[in-house]
Structure formats: C-alpha cells, structure tokens
C-alpha cells in the first residue's frame, strides 16, 4: 500500500512539473507578445501624433498664406499680360525718405524718381509703368524706387542703370487691368499664380503626408484586428 501510494505521488509530481514548465513557457510567450503589442501600440501612437501635427502645421500655413498671399492675389486687378512699347523714360525729381541706422535711430535721405511711360497697344493710351504693386503704394509718381540709403549717388547710379535697360529694350511684357479701371501697368507681379503655386505646394505636401501616415496606421490596426479574429475563428 505504501509502495503504490508513493508511485502515484511521484507520477503526479512529474505531471505537475511538466505542466508548470508548459505554463512558464506559455506565460513567457504571452509576456513577450504583450511587450511586442505594447511597443507596437506606442509606435502607432507616435506615428498618429506625427501625422496630426503635420496636418495642424499645414492648416496654420494655409491660414497664414490665405490672409497674406492669397488675399493680395485675389485683390490684384493687373491680370492681363501683353507686350508694351516704351514711350518715355526719365528721372524727374527727388523725394525724401528715411532709413534705419540702428535701434531707435532714423536718418533722412533722398532718392531719384524714375518715370516710365508705355503705350497701350490696343488703344494707344499713355500709361505710367510701376515696377511692382508695392511701388505704387509707396509713391504713385515713380515707376521705380531704389532702396533708401545714406549714399544718394549710389541710388542715382542704380536708377541710371535701370533707365538704360528700359531704353535698350523698347518692348517688354507688362500686366494691365483688363477692365481699364487702373490707369497704370505693372512690370512684375509680386503675387502671381506661379508664386501662389509654389507657396501652396509645400503645405499641401505636408497635409498629404500627415493624412497618409494616419491612414496607414489605422489600416495597419484594422488588418491586425482582422487577422486576430480570423485566428480565433480557426481555433
């Protein structure tokens, strides 16, 4: 009786030992699996945050461009581009200006005023040419305004070079108002469609990248859940 009981106890002990070994292996596998899932979840969370941050930054860039560049582009009336013939170019007078010489320091100077008149081919009307839209806002009497500086002779030399370039090229493209409300033409548009495209290109790429990152993470999570459900069904 004693011998039979001892054998049974030994067999039971071996069975329990094997079961403990299998349980430890299974627990170890589950622990590794949980660590892997936790690491993947942390990486997915970081990827989603990156995608959302990219989308928020692109929206902010869209907003800034909308209130600055896009607004000026929509308000511009000089939309018709055509060849214009030079009628007259001359330096008429000088105007006072001020420039910064340091913190809380301003000095007065002068700049020469260059006037350029062109011929409107369709009607033969004489129009004043401006370098850009900002030139007309600064001084409506001048076609080209050099940067205000301490050296007046340097400004005069720069304006003389611009004047000679106009005389050398008698025909050049300009932008005019097709409705005829503005009696002036623009040589260079600061807010053209090409500038608008290049300004909106990078925010659009950032937005597309953020959306793609979030979509890829969500797709990966969906496929992972789908595979897990299939494995449970097969079991």
Curated annotation (Swiss-Prot):
GO biological-process terms attached to the record: action potential; detection of calcium ion; neuronal action potential; potassium ion transport
Record note on domains: The ball and chain domain mediates the inactivation of KCNMA1. It occludes the conduction pathway of KCNMA1 channels, and comprises the pore-blocking ball domain (residues 1-17) and the chain domain (residues 20-45) linking it to the transmembrane segment. The ball domain is made up of a flexible N-terminus anchored at a well ordered loop-helix motif. The chain domain consists of a 4-turn helix with an unfolded linker at its C-terminus.
Region (Ball and chain): 1-45
Assembly with partners or alone: Interacts with KCNMA1 tetramer. There are probably 4 molecules of KCMNB2 per KCNMA1 tetramer.
Positions annotated with a glycan in the UniProt record: 88, 96, 119
Name of the featured protein: Calcium-activated potassium channel subunit beta-2
Lipid bilayer topology: Multi-pass membrane protein
Organism listed in the record: Rattus norvegicus
GO MF annotations in UniProt: calcium-activated potassium channel activity; potassium channel activity; potassium channel regulator activity
